[in-house]
Amino acid sequence: MDKTIEMNANPLVEFLRKPSKCFTKADIIAFIREKGIRMIDFMYPAEDGRIKTLNFMINDYAYLETILTDGERVDGSSLFPSFIEAESSDLYVIPRFRTAFVSPFSEIPTLCMLCSFFDKNGEPFECSPERTLHRAAAAFEESTGMTFEAMGELEYYVIADDNGMFPAVDQRGYHESGPFAKFNEFRKQCMAYIAQTGGQIKYGHSEVGNFTQDGKVYEQNEIEFLPNPVETAADQLVLAKWVIRNLAQMNGLDVTFAPKITVGKAGSGLHIHMRMMKDGKNCMIKDHKLSEEARRAIAGMMILAPSITAFGNKTSVSYFRLVPHQEAPTNVCWGDCNRSVLVRVPLGWTSGRDMSVQVNTLEAEANNDTTLKQTVEMRSPDASADIYQLMAGLCVACRYGLEMEKEEALQIATDKYVGIDEAKKGLSKFEQLPDSCVASVKWLEKQRGLYEDKGVFSARMIDGIIRALNKQDDSNLRESAEKDSKLMQKLVESSFYCG
């Protein structure tokens, strides 16, 4: 029995009896025929981070074969205004069969697929975020011999009218249950739909943020994923945001992934966990502790952290979240189980003990390989990020740390490490993260060569990112907004539906 296929929530995996990475055009057509699918949706995230959709009617078998093979053309200048001019803007979109899923929302049976962009010469579009991540993952594997895997923690607020019943404690919503947590069932429905699209979910829960304001209840939730090859991980996060928003609209709820929605309340992040794999083994851990490879990768993230904000924090409001005492990082450092550091090493089941048999005394020891669970977590990004650019940037940073002289990288990791006792004294001795989009641009300009190395990020893409971020013109804006509630509200509203 293949345990990855049995009980799989994706109807295509269940029907075809194979993992999604093995889907072929023939498989897609067989499923369409058997299940009475009438429409095809091509889906692709644009520069604003949101999924765009192109609908096709399956007129006949010949047309179905054509769209699956040849794709379609789209206006690239509308999708990527910072990278493409209107005078030469046409792109092709070609479906990736491994991403196929049945739309959980369409009344007409519809099969959806994420697409890749190609230029007029039939070459992958160099500024496509998805292709950039592909190049980053390939360069990482070629350089290190390891594969880069990731998963995200997707935080969001659900907003609805406050009926005054069973109020939760302000800023104490972590893992709360109903009736004090109002949207547990909505979150579970989101998780079920995300799983149907192919998302591999670890768990979901209510988060710290919970407050009432102007007759509305604001409840923060989180859905966390399982580690996957980094390209798959990015696809799953993009689709998850699409699912949550659509389901909220159907239920008469409002949802925001914005990094900050009011002063003094927990903001929403998009924490990214990473691990490096080789031959089915997790290279993050050795002899029950963090490996040298992991610490060298962390060193790379310490060096590139300021410029990674250009990919992971794309609105001015992003930097209102990166302030002290809000479980968000402000300084470039790392540590164990510490939510104030930039890169956190969470608990990783490193004791080697089977805890289950201690409470389930009828069971035999399972001898599971718990080393697979160890990750490290980058805590600065939020959902304004271009998820593909962000994960590509993290690939580059970890590769850079591994390509440095070994002793130099390990020394950087040592210098940037914060122990528990040291953290209590404050982190001010460490370099601060940028405080605005404009400040992040300055770091990207300094470090762009590292991202362009091996052709991962194109110069054209970096130029476009710099132009877009500079338009925010937000130097000193955080300080001004903290003193001006009307300005703060205006900025929050402008990024309410970001990403």
For each predicted feature, which ranges?
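Short hydrophobic/aromatic-rich motifs at helix boundaries and adjacent loops
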Residues: 1, 162-163, 213-218, 363, ...
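ATP/Mg2+-dependent ligation/transfer catalytic cores
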Residues: 1-210, 228-242, 253, 389-390, ...
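Active-site capping/gating regions of soluble enzymes
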Residues: 17-18, 26-33, 38-48, 52-121, ...
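Histidine-centered divalent-metal-coordination microenvironment in nucleic-acid enzymes
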Residues: 114, 153-167, 210-224, 258-280
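Eukaryote-specific, cytoplasm-facing alpha-helical/coiled-coil scaffolding segments in long proteins
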Residues: 325-327, 416-423, 466-475
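A hydrophobic, small-residue-rich beta->alpha segment in the mid-to-C-terminal subdomain
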Residues: 374, 381-383, 394-452
